[in-house]
């Protein structure tokens, strides 16, 4: 793993087609967007205080390889993964970043396919707060690091692979966001994923997005 931050962003700014899915809500209005096929959870502790659970919906019909990687790292089924790792980079009103379970500083991590794997596609965008995307060190360098958006960073579209959306636990995400950080955007208090895993999705459901 080459040195340097996995997520390359300007300092001033700080980074097979999935089937068209539509469904009708209780009002009868058809919802259009990607379908959640899988869910994972992160139980988070800040310092010595358990602050709650983040639940992330994943879009396996759009980015199946990226989702497979994320789920396997959440469950630890390959013998390594997110459990015990930290959110090592936090920038208020922008994003929180985690997933470096080897170096814990943004220079490490690995995928289930090897050290890195290529960008799958950029069909999903950074639509707003709570979207989950792969951190990288340039094109085709996805590993295990990811970030959760705290704004609508459209300048990252086409550069980072979006694969999920926070469905529950944004209060936990904001608790991490509000932590004091050092000069390298690292929280002064460890924000740890103390447990992680998969939640079964019996019936896929749509997350509505514009222009889908």
From Swiss-Prot:
Inhibited by cyclosporin A (CsA). It comes from the Eukaryota. It catalyses: [protein]-peptidylproline (omega=180) = [protein]-peptidylproline (omega=0). Its EC number is 5.2.1.8. GO terms for cellular component: cytoplasm. Keywords: Cytoplasm, Isomerase, Rotamase. Residues 41-198 form the PPIase cyclophilin-type domain. InterPro entries: Cyclophilin-like_dom_sf, Cyclophilin-type_PPIase_CS, Cyclophilin-type_PPIase_dom. CDD domains: cyclophilin_ABH_like. It is found in: Cytoplasm. Gene3D superfamilies: Cyclophilin-like. PROSITE patterns: CSA_PPIASE_1, CSA_PPIASE_2. Specifically expressed in kidney. PPIase that catalyzes the cis-trans isomerization of proline imidic peptide bonds in oligopeptides and may therefore assist protein folding. Belongs to the cyclophilin-type PPIase family. This is Peptidyl-prolyl cis-trans isomerase C. It comes from Mus musculus.
